[in-house]
A protein has these predicted regions:
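Acidic, Ser/Pro/Thr-rich low-complexity regulatory regions
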Residues: 1-127
């Protein structure tokens, strides 16, 4: 595989992980992908983004983006659970990992390979 292929694969695996930490970094990396930066440079940008402490807003934004994969296939109970979990997260009743575990369950149930291959759903966080 050529370096560009590795860069695209890396971004597929990391984009929601980056978005969880920082929308600004996400946008910056998306723009950088339109240039001729090397795999090493993109990896460094991703690593730097993952050092940023996620905010409530960044977690909710990433959750909403990933939830979009299920909007049409989720049943009513799952839709309600999604709203409840997001509200509980905003109010400090649950942590980020609980939201991600819910999305991982749906990704498995509905076989959403793009999300299943995303590192954000395969990385356990401190509670």
């Amino acid at each position: 595989m050529k370096e560009r292929g590795y860069i695209e694969q890396l971004w597929r695996e990391e984009k929601y992980h980056v978005l969880l930490h920082s929308q600004q970094s996400y946008q910056m990396i998306r723009n950088a992908l339109k240039t001729d930066l090397s795999l090493h440079q993109i990896q460094q940008m991703i690593d730097d983004a993952l050092l940023i402490e996620p905010s409530i807003g960044s977690v909710c934004n990433a959750f909403d983006h990933m939830w979009g994969y299920f909007k049409k296939c989720a049943n009513e109970e799952e839709r309600q659970q999604s709203k409840l979990l997001k509200a509980d997260f905003i109010n400090g009743k649950i942590d980020t990992q609980t939201l991600l575990d819910f999305l991982a369950e749906l990704a498995n149930k509905y076989d959403v390979q793009y999300l299943l291959q995303s590192r954000v759903l395969n990385t356990k966080r401190k509670r």
